[in-house]
C-alpha cells in the first residue's frame, strides 16, 4: 500500500446541532488529565457528560486514557467490518465519525474536549493539527509518518511497513465543541486488529512503535504527544497543567 504525504480529503467527523458559546472569548490554557486505565464506556459517558454540561466559561481539556480491549464502531460504521463475531472482545457503537477500530493495552488514547468556536478552529483545521502532532511525536522517535488521501489517520512513510497504520482519528462535534480524538499504538498485542477491517479498509496493516523497532516508554510518548497537541493548538508558549499523573502508568 503506497502512501503519499498529502492532505486528507475526508475526515471521520460526526457533527450535530449548531455552534454555541462566544467566539470572541479567548481560549484558556488546556488542562491535561490522566484518567488511568478505564473502560471505554466510562470514558465515552464522561466525554458526553462533560460536553453536555459545558458553558462559555468551561475550559478545554485533553484526557489521556488506556483502555482494556474493545472495538468501537462509528455512528455510520458498517458492522460487517468486524470479521470475527466471537472474538471475545466487546463491540461498542459510538457517536464519532469513522468506521471500526480497536483500543487496548499499550495504546495511548487522547480525547480532545475543545470549544472550537472559542479557538476559532474549523473542523478540518483541527484534524490537521491533530495529525501534525502525531507526525511530530513519531518524528521525535526517528519514525517518519504521513497522512494518506481519503484515509484519515497516520501511516508509516517508508520501509518494510510502508503504508501501515499506526494512529487512528475520529471526532464528534456537538454545539461547536469536540470530543473523541486519537489513538497511537506504542506497544500492543496487534492480533485483535486482524479481526477487523481497520477503519473500514480490508487488508490494512496496523503496526505499533515496537513493530518499528522503537522501544518507547508509554509515559514518554504520552508526554511528547500532549506537548505537541497543545503546541499545535495554542502555540509553543501555551500554558497547560503538566500531566504528572502519567508517571503512575505502568508498562507491565
UniProtKB/Swiss-Prot annotation:
Further details from the record: In the reaction, the free carboxyl group of octanoic acid is attached via an amide linkage to the epsilon-amino group of a specific lysine residue of lipoyl domains of lipoate-dependent enzymes.
Name of the protein in question: Octanoyltransferase
Binding site residues for substrate: 96-103, 168-170, 181-183
Enzyme class: transferase
Main localization, broad class: cytoplasm
Organism name: Burkholderia lata (strain ATCC 17760 / DSM 23089 / LMG 22485 / NCIMB 9086 / R18194 / 383)
Active site (record annotation): 199
CDD domains from the UniProt entry: LipB
InterPro entries according to UniProt: aa-tRNA-synth_II/BPL/LPL, BPL_LPL_catalytic, Octanoyltransferase, Octanoyltransferase_CS
Keyword GTP-binding: no
Catalytically driven reaction(s): octanoyl-[ACP] + L-lysyl-[protein] = N(6)-octanoyl-L-lysyl-[protein] + holo-[ACP] + H(+)
BPL/LPL catalytic domain ranges (all copies): 56-237
Role noted for this protein: Catalyzes the transfer of endogenously produced octanoic acid from octanoyl-acyl-carrier-protein onto the lipoyl domains of lipoate-dependent enzymes. Lipoyl-ACP can also act as a substrate although octanoyl-ACP is likely to be the physiological substrate.
Pathway: Protein modification; protein lipoylation via endogenous pathway; protein N(6)-(lipoyl)lysine from octanoyl-[acyl-carrier-protein]: step 1/2
Example of a GO biological process term: protein modification process
MF terms (GO), sorted A to Z: lipoyl(octanoyl) transferase activity
Amino acid at each position: 500500500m503506497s502512501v503519499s504525504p498529502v492532505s486528507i480529503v475526508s475526515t471521520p467527523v460526526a457533527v450535530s446541532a449548531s455552534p454555541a458559546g462566544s467566539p470572541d472569548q479567548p481560549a484558556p490554557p488546556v488542562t491535561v488529565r490522566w484518567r488511568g486505565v478505564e473502560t471505554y464506556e466510562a470514558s465515552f459517558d464522561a466525554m458526553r457528560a462533560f460536553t453536555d454540561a459545558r458553558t462559555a466559561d468551561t475550559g478545554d481539556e485533553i484526557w489521556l486514557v488506556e483502555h482494556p480491549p474493545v472495538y468501537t464502531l462509528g455512528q455510520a460504521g458498517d458492522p460487517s467490518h468486524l470479521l470475527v463475531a466471537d472474538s471475545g472482545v466487546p463491540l461498542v457503537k459510538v457517536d464519532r465519525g469513522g468506521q471500526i477500530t480497536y483500543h487496548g493495552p499499550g495504546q495511548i488514547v487522547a480525547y480532545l474536549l475543545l470549544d472550537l468556536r472559542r479557538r476559532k478552529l474549523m473542523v478540518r483545521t483541527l484534524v490537521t493539527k491533530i495529525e501534525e502532532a502525531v507526525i511530530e511525536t513519531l518524528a521525535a522517535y526517528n519514525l517518519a509518518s504521513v497522512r494518506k488521501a481519503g484515509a484519515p489517520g497516520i501511516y508509516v512513510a517508508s520501509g518494510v511497513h510502508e503504508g501501515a497504520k499506526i494512529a487512528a482519528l475520529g471526532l464528534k462535534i456537538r454545539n461547536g465543541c469536540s470530543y473523541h480524538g486519537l489513538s497511537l499504538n506504542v506497544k500492543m498485542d496487534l492480533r485483535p486488529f486482524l479481526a477487523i477491517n481497520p477503519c473500514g479498509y480490508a487488508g490494512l496493516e496496523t503496526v505499533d512503535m515496537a513493530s518499528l523497532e522503537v522501544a518507547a516508554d508509554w509515559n514518554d510518548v504520552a508526554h511528547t504527544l500532549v506537548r505537541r497537541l497543545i503546541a499545535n493548538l495554542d502555540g509553543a508558549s501555551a500554558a497547560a497543567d503538566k500531566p504528572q499523573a502519567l508517571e503512575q502508568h505502568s508498562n507491565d
